[in-house]
Design a protein with these regions (language model features):
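C-terminal segment of classical bacterial N-terminal signal peptides
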Residues: 1-4
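Subset of outer-membrane beta-barrel
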Residues: 6-239
Length: 239
């Protein structure tokens, strides 16, 4: 029997850089330029080779001082995963791009796309294989007949829509939908390639200013559907 697994980045703190999941939310912030970076290391005490995730992104508004109806948003993103003893690694470079229409009384609607390139690799020579078993253990000096390096590179495309409303009292509301891997790029190596599941994301959040109690209530919701997998994250913060 042959089993298949897929690797794809997931961010639970999407509100820190929403364009990582929805290209339509690129450059919808109040600032003209933003920068985001994230580093995560997992299973430090359990595994000799830790699971590591890196993310870097930057966004900029274009034409907001010249266009009457809104502005263009442009971003650049880089994601990197390094996993386990086999050194399975992925590099993802994406360029989200959108247009934001400014509506009545600080309401905004945008459509965006995100083309990208995915590169994946693993080192087969540092693993153990069935023909290296000598009856007692695995002998790494025996040639495994496996390729010393496996790599693949594919294009991926995402798209989304986004709406945001700002209120005079400082409250706000936003909602969005996006779809990633629309072209279902291949994963796997050599003859064991298979298509990546398309990812569908719905997200909404808000900030409710309570002057009476002098704090801000910010509920958040995101749902992610990808093949047989479902993720639902609900939370809120108080400021």
């Amino acid at each position: 029997n042959i089993s298949f697994a897929q690797q794809d980045p997931h961010f639970s703190m999407w509100y820190s850089s929403p364009s990582l999941l929805n290209p339509a939310s690129t450059a919808t912030m109040e600032q003209d330029v933003t920068f985001f970076t994230n580093y995560r290391a997992q299973w430090l005490s359990a595994l000799p080779n830790q699971i590591r995730t890196n993310a870097v992104s930057a966004e900029i508004k274009l034409g907001n001082d010249r266009l009457r109806s809104g502005w263009f948003g442009l971003g650049a993103q880089y994601n990197n995963d390094a996993t386990g003893d086999a050194q399975i690694m992925s590099h993802i470079v994406s360029i989200p791009f959108n247009y934001v229409w400014e509506g009545y009384e600080k309401s905004y609607f945008s459509l965006g796309i995100k083309p990208g390139v995915i590169n994946r690799s693993l080192k087969a020579q540092i693993q153990t294989w069935d023909n290296q078993w000598n009856g007692i253990g695995f002998d790494n000096t025996v040639f495994s007949t496996e390729s010393s390096s496996n790599k693949n590179t594919h294009l991926t495309v995402g798209a989304g829509m986004y709406y945001k409303k700002l209120y005079r009292d400082g409250s706000k509301f936003d909602i969005g939908f996006s779809a990633n891997h629309l072209n279902a790029p291949e994963q796997g190596f050599r003859s064991l390639s298979f298509q990546t599941f398309r990812q569908y994301i719905f997200h909404t959040s808000g900030s409710i200013k309570l002057d009476r109690y002098k704090f801000l209530l910010s509920p958040q919701l995101i749902t992610m559907f990808q093949g047989p997998h479902r993720d639902v994250i609900i939370g809120t913060s108080f400021d």
